[in-house]
Design a protein with these regions (language model features):
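Short catalytic/metal-binding and nucleic-acid-binding patches
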Residues: 1-174
Length: 174
């Protein structure tokens, strides 16, 4: 058997369940802060929308940080591994096309966690989108453009600023 990364070894024997909620996280290669460039972060966010439009997942909350992303999804079709492979591949192509990069964008593998139905999704969505605040990137969440949530985050001091944010934020969904 070939050597597998720790995250891939953890998935041996596990399966992806349709309509189950998962928190997916992955890091950039060597934790480079590629998405400090907001435009490049938007290219990743657009792949979340593509996955949703193609019926692979419903995005419940996500944030693109300078060197990683967190994505809370309801899996609709395929497996988590297929979804992440597709998202990472397409976002790599988009970023490389935009920047002329030739190197890997992402670390291999990803972290995933299946949520229990009784877990508080609103609390988790708030935790995810508050990452930029905890990291000290902004003072108000509304000042950070690379996040979205359809669950209970409308009161995190963002609405006056939201109309000026990038197309990554759809306040009608909050």
């Amino acid at each position: 058997m070939r050597d597998l990364s720790a995250s891939n070894r953890l998935r041996i024997g596990r399966y992806s369940e349709q309509n189950r909620i998962y928190l997916l996280t992955t890091n950039t290669a060597r934790r480079q802060p590629v998405f400090s460039d907001i435009e490049l972060g938007r290219l990743v966010a657009s792949q979340f929308r593509v996955a949703e439009a193609m019926g692979f997942a419903n995005s419940l909350a996500w944030v693109v940080m300078p060197d990683h992303f967190h994505w809370l999804i309801e899996l609709k079709r395929g497996s988590r591994s297929e979804l992440m492979q597709r998202t990472k591949s397409l976002s790599t192509k988009a970023v490389n096309l935009s920047t002329g990069r030739k190197t890997s964008l992402w670390q291999s593998g990803f972290h995933d966690r299946a949520l229990r139905r009784e877990e508080d999704l609103v609390k988790l969505a708030r935790y995810i989108v508050a990452n930029p605040l905890r990291a000290g990137l902004v003072q108000k969440l509304g000042d950070y453009p690379l996040w979205d949530a359809i669950l209970g985050c409308a009161d995190i001091e963002l609405l006056p600023f939201a109309s000026r944010l990038a197309p990554t934020l759809d306040i009608r969904r909050l």
